[in-house]
């Protein structure tokens, strides 16, 4: 096992700990690509890495090919064998390697959105949870999967009034059971989205089609009906 020098520093793991576990530390990423048959990393290769990839070299990482035509063509040209974390499925169709990333993304979405509702960042000066005498923010979450569920929980926990939409009635029933009273569920269709975005202060897009690009649920025409300063995450 080869590990690039300082690869674990950001996560709190020193080179010495990797060496103690039996790994060999290599000075540069080029050294790792040159020696290893399989590359394991967190994010997709960047352009500087493309020339380092050898034919039939196995890469195991998050790729998100659907969102990057350049990366897709680069991996084809390099004749790499690519295993994408985000498409690894259990027999239940669950995506075990995508779930942790989705949990983080969902929890961060309301935080990031709330930031851009603040006046210092040219927002409308809205507090998600409101204060005495002031209404809380209206938050719309599109998609009731892992990201959407976590986003709705955090926004609701901060006191916002949350609407979460999904195309699965079974999922909406589950969410109805587990969410607090300031979260309402609604079936997702064009009409309901069109009406909900008119009053939303913060909109979180959380729709997933495994291995494919997420659909565009909000059109340019719909954007014109939003309140000025509405934040989309």
What are these regions (language model features)?
Residues 44, 104, 145-147:
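Residue-level detector of alpha-helix initiation sites
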Residues 31-32, 52, 196-197, 222-225:
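Structural alpha-helical scaffold elements that stabilize or flank donor/cofactor-binding regions
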Residues 47-138:
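Glycine/serine-rich phosphate-binding loop and adjoining beta1-alpha1 elements at the start
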Residues 1-13, 122-208:
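Glycine-rich phosphate/diphosphate-binding loop of Rossmann-like nucleotide-binding domains
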Residues 1-74, 78:
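An N-terminal-biased, well-structured beta-alpha scaffold segment characteristic
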Residues 220-233:
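Helical hairpin unit composed of two closely spaced alpha helices linked by a short loop
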Residues 30-47, 180-217, 231:
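Rossmann-like NAD(P)-binding element
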């Amino acid at each position: 096992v080869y590990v690039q020098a300082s690869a674990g520093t950001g996560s709190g793991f020193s080179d010495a700990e990797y060496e103690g576990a039996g790994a060999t530390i290599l000075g540069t990423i080029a050294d790792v690509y040159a020696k290893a048959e399989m590359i394991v990393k967190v994010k997709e290769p960047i352009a500087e890495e493309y020339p380092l990839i050898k034919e039939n070299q196995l890469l195991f990482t998050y790729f998100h090919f659907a969102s990057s035509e350049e990366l897709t063509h680069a991996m084809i040209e390099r004749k790499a064998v690519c295993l994408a974390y985000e498409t690894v499925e259990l027999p239940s169709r669950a995506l075990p390697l995508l779930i942790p990333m989705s949990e983080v993304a969902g929890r961060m979405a309301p935080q990031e959105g709330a930031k851009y509702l603040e006046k210092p960042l040219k927002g409308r000066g809205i507090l998600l949870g409101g204060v005495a005498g002031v209404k809380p923010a209206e938050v719309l979450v599109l998609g009731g999967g892992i990201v959407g569920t976590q986003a709705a929980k955090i926004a609701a926990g901060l006191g916002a009034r949350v609407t979460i939409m999904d195309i699965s009635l079974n999922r909406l029933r589950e969410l109805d059971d587990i969410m607090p009273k300031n979260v309402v569920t609604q079936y997702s269709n064009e009409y309901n989205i069109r009406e909900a975005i008119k009053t939303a202060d913060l909109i979180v897009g959380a729709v997933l089609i495994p291995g494919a690009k997420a659909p565009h649920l909000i059109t340019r025409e719909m954007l014109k009906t939003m309140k000025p300063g509405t934040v989309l995450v």
